[in-house]
Each structure stands twice: as C-alpha cells, then as structure tokens.
C-alpha cells in the first residue's frame, strides 16, 4: 500500500524540531544528499555591469581654501543658490555642490571651484 503525500505531511507536521533534524539526517544518509543551502549564481552579465563606466557624478566641496568669497561666488554661479545658501554650503564643507551630473558638467564645476581656490572631489 502506497502512502499518500498528505499522510507524510501530517506525520512531519506532528514532529518536534529534534525529530525533524533526525529525519533530515536520515534522508541525507539514505539518499547521499545534503540539506545545505544551494549557492545561487549571480547574473551572467554581472562582471560586465561592474566594468561599465559611471554616468552620474557628485561634485563635493571638501575645503573652501583662503579665498572664501570667490568660492561662494563660484558656488552661487554653479548652483543658482542665494548668497546665504551658498555661504552655508561653503561653511559646511565637505558638502555636495552638484549631484547626479554627467562627467563633463562635474569636471567643469570642479575646474571653476578650484580656480576660485577651493579643494574639490568628484565622486
């Protein structure tokens, strides 16, 4: 007589954790398998995506330098902020000046800020 799946499930459902552990070990021995989790392979194109060039950059003002007024003017010109907001950005360095811009815009902003005397990073 064959045992129905429902009967097996009902028997397993009534077992304690210790009994379930012993059952798993018995299955491993009987059928030569392992109950260890299977490592899932990543997507095949994962390596290509990692090599892909970054398209969005953030320009970070790390230090205002000695000519703070010129740096504030440069920040105002680049961001369109008011005088007080631009001063707060410069005083709060390190702070992002431009976010999510393309490489050319990031390099241009870095150049303007460095010409004004600031220290800048592009991330």
From Swiss-Prot:
Citing just one GO molecular function, the answer is: mRNA binding
Q: Identify one Gene Ontology CC term for this UniProt entry.
A: cytosolic large ribosomal subunit
List this protein's GO terms for biological process: translation
Swiss-Prot/TrEMBL keywords: Ribonucleoprotein, Ribosomal protein
Domain of life, per lineage? Bacteria
Instruction: Extract the Pfam families matched here.
Output: Ribosomal_L12 (PF00542), Ribosomal_L12_N (PF16320)
Q: Which InterPro entries does the record cross-reference, listed alphabetically?
A: Ribosomal_bL12, Ribosomal_bL12_C, Ribosomal_bL12_C/ClpS-like, Ribosomal_bL12_oligo, Ribosomal_bL12_oligo_N_sf
Describe the task this protein carries out.
Forms part of the ribosomal stalk which helps the ribosome interact with GTP-bound translation factors. Is thus essential for accurate translation.
Protein family (similarity comment): Belongs to the bacterial ribosomal protein bL12 family.
This protein's assembly is summarised as: Homodimer. Part of the ribosomal stalk of the 50S ribosomal subunit. Forms a multimeric L10(L12)X complex, where L10 forms an elongated spine to which 2 to 4 L12 dimers bind in a sequential fashion. Binds GTP-bound translation factors.
| Identification of the protein by name | Large ribosomal subunit protein bL12
Species whose genome carries this gene? Burkholderia vietnamiensis (strain G4 / LMG 22486) (Burkholderia cepacia (strain R1808))
């Amino acid at each position: 007589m064959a045992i129905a799946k429902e009967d097996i499930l009902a028997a397993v459902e009534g077992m304690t954790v210790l009994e379930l552990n012993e059952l798993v070990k018995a299955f491993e021995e009987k059928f030569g398998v392992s109950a260890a989790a299977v490592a899932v392979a990543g997507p095949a194109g994962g390596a290509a995506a990692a090599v892909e060039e970054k398209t969005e950059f953030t320009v970070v003002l790390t230090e205002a330098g000695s000519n703070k007024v010129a740096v504030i003017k440069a920040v105002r010109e680049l961001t369109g902020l008011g005088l007080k907001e631009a001063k707060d950005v410069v005083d709060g360095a390190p702070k992002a000046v431009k976010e999510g811009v393309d490489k050319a815009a990031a390099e241009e902003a870095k150049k303007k800020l460095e010409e004004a005397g600031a220290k800048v990073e592009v991330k």
